[in-house]
């Protein structure tokens, strides 16, 4: 199990919230105090709540659920794409298109077009078009890749949403809520925690803080996925053994 320590949180600056004048009163239970006009997040609560979020993600992955990582602000983009890919999951780190979840069937059509354009580039069939047509198609492909590249392999709605800064990603959170998709999020002192199922109180602006928490969530997906694979393998071996044993019994009975 990937634990998170107070030392790691402090070194990454997870405890630094927003200026006291820019806060959401609903975050009061997660605030330790203020220093130099900045709210300080109660890291003891972060450790406890992160553990709950981590266990939830492990269980979700073990059940075969997928996760969509969402973080479109500049500080989050690299961590979101790299950690999502490391655990074999999906991500949105450029721009959230309205309806990405609630109108997924339409978004899927754009994903399919992106896949077709990728295939044309890969097998060279794009060269059969005029130079002008090929350039336009490549331009379209790059535009689609930028917004949809991270969900190219997502054939159905995700089981869990992991969000960095729900205030910035309020449309994504709203869509998940409408569809009953659980949301795990890094929630800073200026955010509304009410729509978040698993609140991780923390700094959602510092790159190191985002990287630390995102990598730990990716670890949870990996842990759950590995446990699922072991169980599936054990179940398969058990079924094969049972079938073999049944065959031996039948053979023995026949000889008798």
Curated annotation (Swiss-Prot):
GO terms (BP aspect): translation
Listed GO CC annotations: cytosolic small ribosomal subunit
An example Gene Ontology molecular-function term: structural constituent of ribosome
Gene3D superfamilies the UniProt entry points to: Glucose-6-phosphate isomerase like protein, domain 1, Helix hairpin bin
InterPro entries associated with the record: Ribosomal_uS2, Ribosomal_uS2_bac/mit/plastid, Ribosomal_uS2_CS, Ribosomal_uS2_flav_dom_sf
Keywords, in A-Z order: Ribonucleoprotein, Ribosomal protein
Family: Belongs to the universal ribosomal protein uS2 family.
Protein name in UniProt: Small ribosomal subunit protein uS2
Natural source organism: Geotalea uraniireducens (strain Rf4) (Geobacter uraniireducens)
């Amino acid at each position: 199990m990937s634990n998170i320590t107070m030392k790691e949180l402090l070194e990454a600056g997870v405890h630094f919230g927003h200026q006291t004048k820019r806060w959401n009163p609903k975050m009061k239970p997660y605030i330790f105090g203020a220093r130099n006009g900045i709210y300080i997040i109660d890291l003891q609560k972060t450790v406890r709540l992160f553990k709950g979020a981590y266990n939830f993600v492990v269980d979700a992955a073990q059940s075969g659920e997928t996760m969509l990582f969402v973080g479109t602000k500049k500080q989050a983009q690299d961590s979101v794409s790299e950690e999502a890919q490391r655990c074999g999951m999906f991500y949105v780190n450029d721009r959230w298109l309205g309806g990405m979840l609630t109108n997924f069937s339409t978004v899927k059509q754009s994903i399919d077009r992106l896949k077709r354009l990728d295939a044309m580039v890969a097998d060279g069939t794009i060269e059969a078009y005029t130079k002008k047509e090929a350039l336009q198609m490549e331009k379209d492909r790059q535009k689609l890749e930028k917004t949809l590249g991270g969900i190219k392999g997502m054939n159905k709605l995700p089981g869990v949403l992991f969000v960095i800064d729900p205030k910035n990603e309020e449309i994504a959170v709203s869509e998940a809520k409408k569809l009953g998709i659980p949301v795990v999020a890094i929630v800073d002192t200026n955010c509304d925690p009410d729509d978040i199922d698993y609140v991780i109180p923390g700094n959602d602006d510092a790159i190191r803080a985002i990287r630390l928490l995102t990598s730990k969530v990716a670890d949870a997906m990996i842990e759950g996925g590995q446990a699922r694979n072991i169980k599936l393998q054990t179940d398969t071996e058990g079924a094969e053994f049972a079938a073999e044993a049944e065959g031996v019994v039948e053979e023995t009975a026949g000889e008798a």
